[in-house]
């Protein structure tokens, strides 16, 4: 089931247009859902990919809203999102009117910039807490949290355990076919304030391949950027946060001049970030030999030099953020002119210059037609 994110009058909307009365609930889910009817607080739903987490949440939402409960939903599944576009986490509230209309406005969205938590766990957890804090200010009886399918191995266990410890939910609903979630659940068995419900995954859930998941994301991106236009942003007047190297987009002219004079290179941008120098070379200049970069490292007394060209940034997904860090929507880099200090961006028509105060540059590459592109590792010396 694919839920497209719509933009209505400048707001993100989730197309929740389904006939719930025709949905069948597996028998062993019914008693759990009935118990959750009187469960105040936060409910985290855990399960590996294709275990039925989203289906359970949709059924649970329908069941509780019909019984006059005020429901909040937080979607943390950045690779297979249902509220916001991929690479984001988002929150909505649901009542009878919204459920009847079939469109649920996204009230808050945060950019993660990746489609897997691996490689950005700290950022992921910090932003989950930020979104959760906002949810606690709303009039919600039950907050339901959808999670990623990353539950196995040391990373999956650490991620889910950290999530539970930070949010401190009232209940966990664990969809497991065997004992795959026990390394997580066993850590919380003795917590008296936490209810743990173990249920079997739905047998009717279609198992999706990696390609199926990629195609689903591409459809979401294509739909999201279907009416995109281009605009230029002056990055001398806009704060830019880069998740790739930590670039500030404020070039160090002293380093640029030094490299031009001593090493006969023509960088259009240079910045020292901790013990690394990032050089952006003028195109179509070819990458010089390794020896030059070894000498640059010695001269600048750094551990690493990264060399890229401006076109390396093409098609990176970005977020237009408000002053408090929430996302007002996504865009795609078309090109960057470091000499003119301009970024040309594909952006949805609903986003205006007044709607954002900073740009975050993610680690996902996608074309406006939705096609996902591989991440090109930069040249490092």
Where are these regions (language model features)?
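Hydrophobic positions on the alpha1 helix immediately C-terminal to the Walker A/P-loop
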Residues: 56, 60
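Phosphate/Mg2+-binding loops and adjacent switch elements
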Residues: 134, 138-200
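The conserved Walker
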Residues: 49
């Amino acid at each position: 089931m694919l839920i497209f994110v719509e933009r209505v009058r400048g707001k993100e909307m989730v197309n929740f247009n389904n006939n719930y009365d025709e949905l069948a609930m597996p028998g062993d889910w019914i008693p759990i859902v009935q118990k959750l009817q009187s469960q105040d607080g936060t409910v985290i739903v855990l399960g590996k990919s294709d275990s039925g987490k989203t289906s359970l949440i949709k059924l649970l939402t329908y069941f509780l809203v019909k019984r006059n409960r005020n429901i909040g939903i937080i979607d943390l599944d950045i690779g297979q999102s249902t509220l916001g576009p991929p690479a984001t986490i988002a929150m909505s509230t649901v009542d009878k009117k919204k459920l009847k209309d079939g469109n649920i406005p996204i009230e808050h969205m945060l950019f993660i910039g990746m489609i897997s938590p691996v490689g950005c766990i700290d950022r992921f957890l910090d932003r989950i807490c930020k979104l959760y804090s906002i949810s606690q200010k709303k009039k919600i009886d039950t907050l339901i949290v959808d999670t990623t399918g990353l539950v196995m191995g040391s990373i999956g266990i650490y991620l889910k355990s950290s999530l539970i410890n930070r949010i401190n939910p009232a209940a966990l609903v664990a969809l497991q076919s065997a004992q795959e979630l026990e390394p997580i659940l066993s850590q919380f068995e003795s917590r008296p304030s936490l209810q743990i419900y173990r249920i079997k995954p739905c047998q009717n859930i279609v198992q999706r391949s990696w390609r199926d998941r990629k195609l689903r994301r591409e459809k979401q991106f294509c739909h999201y950027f279907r009416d995109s236009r281009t605009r230029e942003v002056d990055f001398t007047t806009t704060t830019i946060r880069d998740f790739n190297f930590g670039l500030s987009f404020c070039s160090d002219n002293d380093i640029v001049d030094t490299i031009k004079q001593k090493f006969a290179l023509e960088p259009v941008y240079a910045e020292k970030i901790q013990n690394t120098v990032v050089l952006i070379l003028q195109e179509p200049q070819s990458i010089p030999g390794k020896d030059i970069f070894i000498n640059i490292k010695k001269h600048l007394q750094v551990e690493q030099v990264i060399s890229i060209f401006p076109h390396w940034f093409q098609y990176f997904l970005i977020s237009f953020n408000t002053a408090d860090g929430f996302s007002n929507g996504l865009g795609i880099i078309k090109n960057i002119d470091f000499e003119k200090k301009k970024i040309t961006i594909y952006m949805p028509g609903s986003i205006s210059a007044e709607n954002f105060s900073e740009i975050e540059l993610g680690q996902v590459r996608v074309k406006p037609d939705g096609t996902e592109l591989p991440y090109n590792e930069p040249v490092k010396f």
